[in-house]
Amino acid sequence: MNKKYILFFLFGLLSITISAQSLAEAKALYEKGEYEEAKPTFKKLVKTQPGNGNYNLWYGVCCLETGEPAEALKHLESAVKRRVPSGQLYLARAYNDLYRFEEAIETYETYISDLRKRKRSTEEAEQLLEKSKS
């Protein structure tokens, strides 16, 4: 009986270690802009922890950057609900890619307002906002 518990514990520990390695690898790929390669790991992580805002952001950005704005949308909305930094920027881009310009404009404006409150540069977001308006 004790052997079963030990095996179960070791298997669980191994799974956590593999998951951590996969996350670290996926984040490294993401940071390098290798979104297609990082996407499967983030997809698995979102399935196991759908409430994790960062996982939703990373997976959503991977989808957006690989030409899947519709798939990205729900994950980016989830990230924004959980107040993940930069989530609004990518959500606005997804709205824009889906021709939902009013929502894109509103989201960019909210993002710019948040940046100003934190005394951060708004230049990139303002350029994207103007692009959505035209």
List the model feature ranges, each with a label:
Residues W58, Y90, E124-L128:
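Canonical tetratricopeptide repeat
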Residues E31-K32, E65-T66, D97, E130-S134:
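Register position in tetratricopeptide repeats
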Residues Q21-K44, T48:
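Alpha-helical segment of the N-proximal tetratricopeptide repeat
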